[in-house]
């Protein structure tokens, strides 16, 4: 199957009351693991690519060609979107789209509201003309992820969310409602009352960033309140690192990179399968 935009898969998730996982990729093995999990689970999947990860892998075009090649060689039949995570500017989003990304996030949340609307509208106009879906953000998600640093959580304002959606025509919205990038200190406290209000005011799929470490019952409640996309990265990083460390501790003389990285790839696949089942997306690509 060819790459698709996120729009239809997220609208279907919203109607079906489940969420599609965005799992960030960092190299070939991460991409293999996530695609293999999606195919095995018959789940739609979103491959998230941060600007930092794209630079690490060689650039937007390299990433797109790698994903397309793997999808062909692995006989992937489920819907796959390749999504720019936290695009920092119109120019970065345009470069990703021109390289073949099927979805982009423009993160202008650190700008004043009117500037956020202006930049987001510019991205939507360019993206939609090319069949590419757009995610935007309001408020501040705490923690740190690659080039994105949010010192503390600032909740999104529901009325601003409604206005942003109406004025820009975005396909999904990531309102900051208590989640953070990276590990949580203590138990997460998501703003479910605000989430429900934003769902009712906007009517579009909502996105939960910082999905690692949020208890299953909170994940399920978020999905019931319109969250249709959940981002996971830290959990895969931890699983990968744990597997590689265990291998090296067991056999410090190993030097074949495939033997070192392989267990990490397997750990990511197992983690992603668990998340797909938790989010309710398993089996949805077969319907």
From Swiss-Prot:
Binding positions (D-glyceraldehyde 3-phosphate): 50
- Enumerate the cofactors the protein uses: Zn(2+)
Q: What does it catalyze?
A: beta-D-fructose 1,6-bisphosphate = D-glyceraldehyde 3-phosphate + dihydroxyacetone phosphate
* Keyword Phosphoprotein applies: yes
The UniProt annotation places dihydroxyacetone phosphate binding at 182, 210-212, 231-234
CDD domains, sorted: TBP_aldolase_IIB
Gene Ontology molecular-function annotations:
fructose-bisphosphate aldolase activity; zinc ion binding
Q: At which positions is Zn(2+) 2 bound?
A: 107, 137
Pathway(s) per entry:
Carbohydrate degradation; glycolysis; D-glyceraldehyde 3-phosphate and glycerone phosphate from D-glucose: step 4/4
Under SUPFAM superfamilies, the record lists: Aldolase (SSF51569)
Q: Gene3D superfamilies, per this entry?
A: Aldolase class I (3.20.20.70)
Enzyme Commission no:
4.1.2.13
GO terms (BP aspect): fructose 1,6-bisphosphate metabolic process; glycolytic process
Cofactor binding remark: Binds 2 Zn(2+) ions per subunit. One is catalytic and the other provides a structural contribution.
- State the function annotated in the UniProt record: Catalyzes the aldol condensation of dihydroxyacetone phosphate (DHAP or glycerone-phosphate) with glyceraldehyde 3-phosphate (G3P) to form fructose 1,6-bisphosphate (FBP) in gluconeogenesis and the reverse reaction in glycolysis.
What is the similarity comment for this entry?
Belongs to the class II fructose-bisphosphate aldolase family.
Recorded protein name is Fructose-bisphosphate aldolase
Q: Which organism is it from?
A: Geobacillus stearothermophilus
